[in-house]
Each structure stands twice: as C-alpha cells, then as structure tokens.
Amino acid sequence: MFLRHCITFTLIALLAGCAGFGSREALQGHGDPQQWRAHKEQLSSLDGWQINGKVGIRAPRDSGSGTLFWLQRQDYYDIRLAGPLGRGAARLTGRPGGVVLEVANQGRYEAASPEALLEEQLGWQLPVSHLVWWVRGLPAPDSKSKLTLDGDSRLASLDQDGWQVQYLSYTEQNGYWLPERLKLHGKDLDVTLVVKDWQPRQLGH
C-alpha cells in the first residue's frame, strides 16, 4: 500500500540533530578533495530549511507517489506527506526524545525515537536518521561511507549502511548548492525525491 511506504519515507526522513562532522569517508571520482571539504563544511552549518517537493516510492509489491513538505528548525522537524487525491496523508513532528506520527483516518502514534516508531509500526529496521544529511548532499556522520564526487566536487553518489544514494541534479539557493533530484536504493525499497523549492537557513545554536 502507498500509505505503508509513505509512512516509511516519513520516518526515514527523521533526524538525530544537525550537529556533527567527520564521517569516515572513502573518496573517489573527479572532484577535488579540498573543494569537497569546503563544500561539506558550508552545508554542515545549515540547521534550518523548508522543502517542498515530490516523492516516489517503489517496493516489490506496490508503489506510489505524493507531495512532501519538510520544515527543519535545528533539532525540531515537521514533515508532511500527502498521496494522490489526499490519500495517505501523514504528519510527523518532534525532536530528539519524542516523536509523534499522525496518519489520516488511522490515528496518532508516539515513540521516543524515529527508529523505535518505525520498528513498532512496520517491523522494519532502517537508518532513519540519515536523510537529514543525505538531503543536503552529505554523508551521515560517525558511519563509514563511500563517496563519488562529480566534476564540481559535490556528491555524485554515496554508499552508506546498506543504502545507495544517487545525486542526479543540484540547484543553487542563497549561496548553497543543494540536491534537487536524488534517488535512494535500499533493500526492497527505492525512493525518488524531487525538490521543487529549497529554502535553506543558518539559524545558529
């Protein structure tokens, strides 16, 4: 069902905070490592954004698509997904220590972490805290990653914790080069994210 995977994507999109730096990286590709480090440091300073876009999800037995709204304010998030014709609407809000998932016509669910909520509701174990980094074009910190740089010293692809992420295009907003279209491939799950509107902000701590 689309709703099942809509909830899955919402939970994948959760975060463990925007601070942190220094993932263990293996670099390859055509980019310049020094330029990559400067690009990475700039993007790591982003601790606020608003994203509007579309998400497509494909699994072995079903698939679906919907719209995405993601508001990030340091460690607080408000993520909303809506399926075609309003079906499968879900909203996830919270910060480290408390997560609330509201699903249209189904109910309200709470957990201490996005990982716990995902396992409780769907029985799946996924690196749900990584997408806050991946959506900015960064590897998640404190986890080994294999990175391929493009000619502009930005990520062309990354492999991390059993997931492969492809960066198909970037867009420049407020001096930041940010992913515009990306594909995520995990075990039995493929996700395509197209960002229509990026509003990055550096809020400070």
UniProtKB/Swiss-Prot annotation:
It comes from the Bacteria. Residues 1-17 form the signal peptide. GO terms for biological process: lipoprotein localization to outer membrane; protein transport. Keywords: Cell outer membrane, Chaperone, Lipoprotein, Membrane, Palmitate, Protein transport, Signal, Transport. A lipid is attached at C18 (S-diacylglycerol cysteine). It is found in: Cell outer membrane. The keyword Chaperone applies. Its main location: membrane. Monomer. Plays a critical role in the incorporation of lipoproteins in the outer membrane after they are released by the LolA protein. This is Outer-membrane lipoprotein LolB. It comes from Pseudomonas putida (strain W619).
